[in-house]
């Protein structure tokens, strides 16, 4: 299993080691201004469309967003940075599924590679079955922001149906934001992504030891150097990611 660590941009100017052997996820939204570093073009990188960020913008700035233009820019960025793995624009709640399928086809036709299809509860189980038959890489949304997401998180065994159906159709499956260290050993996703290493912002400290990633929350302590803590946690998650790739 591959664990892609998201949110690296926050420490990119403070992490002085090579990332070429680290699985990273970044969002087009982070780079849409045209600025990005080499890690975006490395082999072990997966690109998110950034659509979720735009949809959930609290300022209302993107209420009347032109998704046609955004899709065109997304395609241009994928081409320019030679991405091999990238997600579709899963914006069903804004433009509807038919438009999402239109954008998916547009991206595939322009790049020559199908984007990773992102299933959410509104699409229904039949749509998951069809996607597993039609695409070789699919993603499963389990965010707690939705009712079904909360239900799944409370009973992760329910994910087995999705995982098994994907594998039975020779499709790879990605768990969007699913990195429960307890359940990753039990659920055979092909890949997942996580920002959990950034929970240092809440004072959490991670330590990979004896094949386990442990989380500590020291009480009555103040963080003197936030970047040092984030980098420490990032390194420990990289260790866990390396272990997971070989053993999960």
Describe every region a protein language model picked out.
Residues 30-40, 93-106, 123-127, 145-164, ...:
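Active-site-adjacent beta->alpha loops and helix N-cap segments on the catalytic face
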Residues 44-46, 105-113, 153-183:
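Alpha-helix-loop-beta-strand connector modules within alpha/beta enzyme cores
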Residues 62-65, 125-130, 179-194:
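Catalytic cores of alpha/beta
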Residues 201-248:
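C-terminal accessory extensions appended to soluble enzyme cores
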Residues 1-108, 240-248:
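Non-catalytic, usually N-terminal nucleic-acid engagement modules in DNA/RNA processing proteins
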Residues 117-149:
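Histidine/lysine/aspartate-rich catalytic loop segments that bind and position anionic ligands
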Residues 48, 117, 187:
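Conserved, mostly hydrophobic/aromatic
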Residues 139-142, 170-180, 191-196:
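Glycine-rich anion-binding loop/nest that anchors nucleotide
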């Amino acid at each position: 299993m591959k664990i892609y660590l998201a949110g690296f941009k926050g420490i990119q100017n403070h992490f002085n080691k090579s990332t070429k052997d680290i699985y990273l996820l970044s969002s087009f939204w982070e780079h849409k201004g045209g600025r990005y570093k080499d890690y975006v073009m490395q082999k072990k990188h997966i690109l998110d469309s950034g659509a979720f960020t735009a949809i959930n913008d609290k300022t209302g700035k993107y209420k009347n967003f032109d998704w046609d233009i955004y899709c065109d820019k997304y395609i241009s960025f994928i081409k320019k940075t030679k991405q091999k793995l990238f997600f579709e624009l899963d914006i069903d709640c804004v433009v509807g599924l038919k438009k999402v399928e239109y954008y998916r086809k547009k991206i595939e036709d322009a790049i020559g590679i199908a984007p990773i299809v992102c299933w959410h509860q509104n699409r229904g189980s039949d749509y998951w079955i069809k996607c597993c038959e039609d695409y070789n890489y699919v993603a499963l949304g389990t965010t707690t922001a939705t009712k079904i997401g909360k239900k799944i998180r409370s009973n992760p065994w329910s994910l087995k149906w999705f995982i098994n159906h994907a594998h039975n159709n020779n499709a790879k499956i990605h768990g969007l934001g699913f990195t429960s260290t307890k359940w990753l050993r039990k659920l055979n996703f092909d890949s997942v992504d996580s920002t959990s290493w950034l929970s240092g912002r809440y004072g959490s400290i991670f330590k990979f030891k004896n094949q386990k990633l442990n989380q500590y929350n020291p009480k009555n302590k103040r963080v003197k150097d936030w970047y040092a803590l984030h980098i420490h946690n990032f390194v420990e998650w990289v260790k866990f990611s390396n272990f997971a790739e070989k053993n999960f």
